Regions:
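Short, flexible active-site loops
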Residues: 139-149, 178
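Active-site nucleophilic cysteine motif
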Residues: 136, 150-167
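...with weaker cross-activation on analogous glycine-rich loops/strands in unrelated enzymes
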Residues: 169-190
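Short, conserved secondary-structure segments in the cores of folded domains
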Residues: 23, 91, 183-187
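Single-stranded RNA-binding regions, centering on S1/OB-family and related RNA-binding modules
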Residues: 5
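Boundary regions of SH3-family modules and the immediately adjacent low-complexity/disordered segments
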Residues: 1-2, 18, 25, 29-32, ...
Length: 190
């Protein structure tokens, strides 16, 4: 089994192995995954945090070993909380709100023994309930993008998944999956 991680700001994940195929979700910086199948230009991946499958262009994959993958599986994720932050190893690059900072220590993330200096705000674990609303309002007027997961283009279930991620809660990717978890509340007296 091969493993990978996103070291780019945003990577499109497609339904089929083609540049013109539907984008079903996006990988944000620091999100890791299993590589299920490798073809000439594309790899089929299983995203760790939500078990979502799709195709990613091979040029956009950073390979990690199983030991690093297992370490990432066990650690409590540190998450960037600003609309746009800067992270850099050799060069600085923007990362969006909700990106993961693997093996985060004080001001840097670590991927494949390479340090990525981080300048911005982050959170780890559960946040106060009022932060949920504050974070949600940041996405006000964000454009709709099918499969999107950033303030620059987002869909309904991507929005819900990211807002709760910032609260330390893992949710599945699609709305139908999200509706199947949690507790049903009755708002009408019976």
């Amino acid at each position: 089994m091969k493993y990978g991680i996103s070291t780019l700001s945003i990577i499109p994940v497609r339904q089929l192995p083609s540049d013109t195929a539907e984008m079903t979700t996006q990988l944000l910086f620091g999100e890791h995954f299993k590589i299920l199948e490798v073809r000439k230009k594309w790899s089929k991946v299983l995203i760790s945090h939500d078990d979502y499958k799709g195709w990613v262009c091979n040029k956009q994959i950073t390979i990690i070993d199983e030991e690093e993958y297992q370490k990432l599986e066990k650690e409590t994720a540190t998450i960037s909380t600003d609309i746009l932050d800067i992270i850099g190893a050799d060069i600085n690059q923007p990362i969006v709100m909700g990106s993961i900072l693997p093996s985060y220590k004080s001001d840097h993330a670590l991927i494949n023994n390479k340090m990525y200096k981080f300048t911005g705000n982050s959170t780890q674990g559960f946040s106060q309930k009022k932060k949920l609303i504050e974070n949600a309002l940041i996405y006000l007027n964000a454009p709709y993008l099918w499969g999107g997961r950033s303030p620059f283009g987002i869909d309904c279930s991507g929005f819900t998944q990211l807002i709760y991620r910032l609260q330390g809660v893992k949710l599945p990717r699609d709305a139908y999956q999200q509706s199947e978890i949690g507790n049903t509340l009755s708002f009408i007296e019976e």
